[in-house]
Regions:
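Conserved SAM-binding loop of SAM-dependent methyltransferases across substrates and taxa
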Residues: 35-47
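C-terminal substrate-binding/active-site "lid" region of AdoMet-derived donor-dependent transferases
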Residues: 116-177
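Conserved acidic E/D residue at the C-terminus of a beta-strand in Rossmann-like folds
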Residues: 54-55, 102-104
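S-adenosyl-L-methionine
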Residues: 54-95
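Class I SAM-dependent transferase core
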Residues: 1-24, 29, 63-66, 70-71, ...
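Short beta-strand element of Class I
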Residues: 48-52
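A short, conserved alpha-helix within the catalytic core of class I
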Residues: 108-116
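Conserved S-adenosyl-L-methionine
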Residues: 32
Length: 184
């Protein structure tokens, strides 16, 4: 795999944070954290959260730690490892059962990773999954429903102003599709 992806667009970050309905305290997992932007912003908004950020790509943990220092926040754990393997073993102290999960990674193992997350998700917990395709939605939504979670699907599209010779036009950005499950 290549270097960590760039920061998620601000419109996507805002939608994902809103979907997480961040509590004042609790445990947040950011799996497939990339640069850590969403988890670190959540920690900045809710400093009492315990954040576990996981990114498997080489250099990912160092980048997340550097971004955390820049934002003056302290994640509980930043790990450069495969999230599915991590969840199959022992997790760092106090982080074994999340209240909120942002599942941004998983690649071809995303279905197995979601199953592992659902086994550890606390009652009233929320999992939010950004999706690039409707096929991914068709694959993952039934897992949330079969586990008895309340499911929401959202799509948001933003437009940004682009200069024209005599004004500004609105250029559409790719839509942002999210799948959210809330455990009862």
């Amino acid at each position: 795999p290549g270097p960590p992806v760039l920061l998620a667009r601000r419109e996507a970050r805002a939608q994902l944070r809103a979907g997480l309905a961040l509590p004042d305290r609790g445990r947040l997992w950011d799996l497939g954290a990339g640069t850590g932007s969403i988890g670190l912003e959540a920690l900045r908004l809710r400093p009492q959260l315990k954040l576990l950020a996981v990114e498997r790509r080489a250099g990912g943990a160092a980048l997340i730690q550097a971004n955390a220092a820049r934002l003056a926040v302290k994640p509980s754990a930043v790990l450069e490892t495969d999230a599915l393997q991590l969840l199959a073993g022992d997790l760092p102290d106090g982080l074994a059962q999340p209240d909120r999960v942002l599942l941004g990674g998983g690649g071809p193992n995303r279905e197995a990773l979601l199953r592992a997350v659902l086994q550890r998700l606390r009652p009233s917990g929320i999992v939010v999954i950004p999706l690039a395709t409707v096929e991914a939605l068709a694959l993952l939504r039934p897992l949330l429903e079969q586990a008895g979670l309340t499911v929401q699907v959202n799509q948001v599209q933003a437009w940004r102003g682009q200069p024209l010779s005599d004004g500004t036009r609105l250029a559409p950005m790719n839509p942002i599709l999210t799948l959210k499950g809330t455990k009862s």
